[in-house]
Amino acid sequence: MQKFYTLICTLVLLLSMTFMAPVSALAADYTPVVTENEISVFLETSYDNAKIWAWNDKVKQFTTAEWPGDAMTLMGTKDGKNVFKWTYTAGTEIPTGVIFSHDGGQKLNGGNQEFKNHGYYVE
């Protein structure tokens, strides 16, 4: 009887490891979070790196780095894609234009796009 019990326990353990591990490994999709007064945008992309270039009529460059701009921060994933965030902290002016890029300046979504504060852009 003890051998039978040990066999059943071993089978249950193996089955749970086989079928439950992949389910528990799935992380919940990232949900964007912003603070009230922040200037920020999100980008959902299949690439593992993203940069941003932002400007308006008065300010030629909102980024601290030269082209292709600032590296965006990886926040999590959604539907298997990476979600990046960029936050502007150097002032209260808001950009009107934005370009997202990857791998040394390859433009995403055709290049120039309208900047929307707290906007969520998808590649």
Set out the residue ranges of the language-model regions.
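Beta-strand-connecting loop/turn residues
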Residues: L11, N37, D48, G80-N82, ...
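Aromatic-rich carbohydrate-binding modules that target alpha-glucans
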Residues: S46-T92, G105-N112
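Sec-dependent signal peptide cleavage junction
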Residues: M17-P32
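Bacterial N-terminal signal peptides that target proteins for export
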Residues: M1-C9
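Extracellular beta-sheet/turn segments enriched in Thr/Pro/Gly and aliphatic residues
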Residues: Y30-P32, Q113-E123
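Structural beta-strand segments of beta-rich domains
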Residues: T35-V41
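Exposed beta-strand face motif in extracellular beta-rich ectodomains
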Residues: E93-V98
